[in-house]
Amino acid sequence: MKHQQILRLCCAAAFAAVIYVFTAIFHIPVHTGYTHVGDGFIYLAACLLPWPYAAAAGAIGAGLADLFSGYAIWFPGTVIIKALTALCFSHQAERIVCVRNLAGLIPAWALCIGGYFMYEGIITGNFGVALLGIPGYIVQVLSSTAVFLALGKALDGIRIKSRLQLH
């Protein structure tokens, strides 16, 4: 039991680091923020780890990316949105890319696009301006989905879930 908790914690920390890198370092500035593929790694974490670990990895990795990339105003919204994103996926399925997790992409997209639209509308006091960010959020969720599907298929091919036994 203790070994499994340590393994989960280490995997969550590794995911937080990867999420940070693919959010903070490999991003494209758009509108009032930036777009990135870090969400694809949040999706993967949520398919491999129980919710609290995946939520922490997403919130910490993406939140720190905002703090250290000059977008600290986005930190509170990011922490909430990314933690909730982990709820959209299941770590209990035998495979990463399965019907359940493919269906989870839809609410994950809605959370990202809708969550950041609402957050930007609140912090700017102008929902008209917030509408301008939606195309960037769409690019973000679609590119993150491509990363998730490619890596998920590859990891399923080497049976990573049965090898790690994180659930």
Regions of interest found by a model, annotated:
Residues M1-H167:
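Loop-helix junctions at membrane interfaces
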